[in-house]
Amino acid sequence: MRAAEERKGVVPAARRRDQFPVGMRVLAVDDDPVCLKVLETLLLRCQYHVTTTNQAAIALKMLRENRDMFDLVISDVHMPDMDGFKLLELVGLEMDLPVIMLSVNGETKTVLKGITHGACDYLLKPVRIEELRNIWQHVIRRKFSTRDRANLDFYEECNKPPNADSDHVHGHVTCGSPDQSGRPSKKRKEYCSEEEDEGEVNTQDIDDPSAPKKPRVVWSVELHRKFVAAVNQLGIDKAVPKRILELMNVEKLTRENVASHLQKYRLYLKRLSAVASQQVSIVAALGGRDPFLHMGGFEGLQGYQAFTSSAALSSFTPHGLLNSPRNNPAALGTQGVPASKSIQTMSGSHTLSHSINDANKYHLSLPGNQKGNLGQGLAASLGQTQMQQKWIHEETDDLSTILSGNGLSNGMSGTLQSVTSSPLLPQELAECTQAKIVSQPSIRTSSVSSEHIEGAVGVSSGLLESRVSQQSTIPLSGFSANGLLIHGSFNNTCANKLGGTSSSCAPARSSNDLMVARDTKGGASSFGGAMLLPPDTEQKYLNFGGGNGLKQKFDDRTADSLFDPKFVWSSVPSSQLASNIGAHHAMSQRWNNSSSNSSNIGARMIGQATSSGSTVIPQMKTDFLVSGDMAMPKNASDLSIPKLQSELSSSSCSFDGLLNSIVKVEKDDVTFSDDLGCGDFYSLGACI
């Protein structure tokens, strides 16, 4: 009878404690009957009480029905009905019993998985009896660890500060704390000893697996939201579990649950604060700035101070951003200029529309020994510390662009640098026209159209003001050999009413060549032109009549009379002309008739001037030489210009800043003579 009871594990608890580890109750689970029999035999030799089963589900059922019948569980890892790791998790959560895993797989990954899932040991098959004789240590270790956790919780509760909870404000003291005289209080010692005795009793109750456990509280999203609302209402510093519990008003929620969650919530807030402080410290150490607080509006770039970086700008490659006419319908560059300072601006085909009344000043200043940076503007040797920029967007009948710079005479020599060695324009336009201008304190140009002109005009540092559009940009066309070539020069009595493509170049000084590129597209009756006016005369310029007016005038005259233009130049003293200028300006214009009766006229103007600051414009005479490979149009109506292209470029075609200007629009009507061969240019200060 006694042996049967011992075999079934119904031995009294007092007797088991006296003979421990003899009589320790072990549950063995393995699907292999041979291994299970060997394991049972070895456990019996160690004087353990063994219960065996070959299914994990049956073992779990036995544990749930009789929690106090077993002290240890030995389970195989690989079983058909249930994985050994799954059984390990369920036993650890429900019974809190030590579980030893047994398997033939001794890989580190598998062993680590078993330990992380809560296994107290991992044995390899075939198991040895020496290993089974010491498995009782896990049972003792688990009991003492449970008791230590209970004592630790009680110690923390006993030594809790009085101001941590409202329940401890009155009458609760720290165990063993000295009184006012510095001696430990006897009453407090007695109180703590009584609490320890109660803790031992509670520990014995905890050791009993049959004792019911407290229900676990799952903090759902809604429950946590109520908790956070209560904490925010009370304040994180004044929030105590009792007050939070009253505000939450949730059933089956105890003060201990709220206290534990409050502690975790405070740790979470501290961690967030530490991360934020670390980020701020890193930003401060690296010298960073808030990317949003210091941003200015796109429209308001007033007071923009130039960077003073000493690093030179890198040159653009031939296939770079400014290499294609599509991406760069207009460019401004220099050639053969000293490489001491470099200026470079970005010109694209994006649409930028601004009011003509919006004038933004860019304060640009660079030391003489430093080089300009990308997007920085003009170099310091231009003598300009301010630059006003206005973007003109006229949708009706006029697109006028005026370049006015009062700092061109302050020393434009040797300040621009070519940033590329490859041409921006196609190979056909590799031979660019070049002209030399005298530094003028004021230069103004205008481009008038009867219809909406769409184009892209790029200038250094945003000096040229026009509408930049990506809707329709015209690729630059070159000079073909079969085109109608017209060669001529200007004088002060000639006026040119030709519409089409014109190219001209102007340098900052006589030793350097300046290139300006411009590409503009107009409608079938649109016309565009640019001219420069000196300050010594009336600052008016030709207003090309667009649309039906110009075409109607062309219809009434022959083409022969068209090629006899007349430009009226401002009167200039002959002494200045003789002393300062000996120049010959030639215009090369080309007609290229296409299937849509469109015409492209190329104009080439070459001028020479001295490097002095004279504002005198040389007299120029215009003569035309028509090649015989194409017949002259009989009717002037064939000369209607559907598109206007104007390029100002050079062989190197670098994209640098040239003019530091203020935009101003002036227009004036033009009176044509009876023979349509004369027009009035009131004054021309420089040639572009």
Curated annotation (Swiss-Prot):
It is found in: Nucleus. The modification 4-aspartylphosphate is found at residue 76. Residues 25-140 form the Response regulatory domain. Its main location: nucleus. Residues 161-212 are annotated as: Disordered. InterPro entries: ARR-like, CheY-like_superfamily, Homeodomain-like_sf, Myb_dom, Myb_dom_plants, Response_reg_B-typ_pln, SANT/Myb, Sig_transdc_resp-reg_receiver. Residues 211-270 bind DNA. PROSITE patterns: HTH_MYB, RESPONSE_REGULATORY. One of its GO terms (cellular component) is nucleus. The keyword Membrane does not apply. Two-component system major event consists of a His-to-Asp phosphorelay between a sensor histidine kinase (HK) and a response regulator (RR). In plants, the His-to-Asp phosphorelay involves an additional intermediate named Histidine-containing phosphotransfer protein (HPt). This multistep phosphorelay consists of a His-Asp-His-Asp sequential transfer of a phosphate group between first a His and an Asp of the HK protein, followed by the transfer to a conserved His of the HPt protein and finally the transfer to an Asp in the receiver domain of the RR protein. The keyword Ribonucleoprotein does not apply. SMART domains: REC. It holds the Pfam family Myb_DNA-binding. One of its GO terms (molecular function) is DNA binding. Residues 193-208 have a biased composition (Acidic residues). Keywords: Activator, Cytokinin signaling pathway, DNA-binding, Nucleus, Phosphoprotein, Transcription, Transcription regulation, Two-component regulatory system. Transcriptional activator that binds specific DNA sequence. Functions as a response regulator involved in His-to-Asp phosphorelay signal transduction system. Phosphorylation of the Asp residue in the receiver domain activates the ability of the protein to promote the transcription of target genes. May directly activate some type-A response regulators in response to cytokinins. NCBIfam families: myb_SHAQKYF (TIGR01557). Belongs to the ARR family. Type-B subfamily. This is Two-component response regulator ORR23.
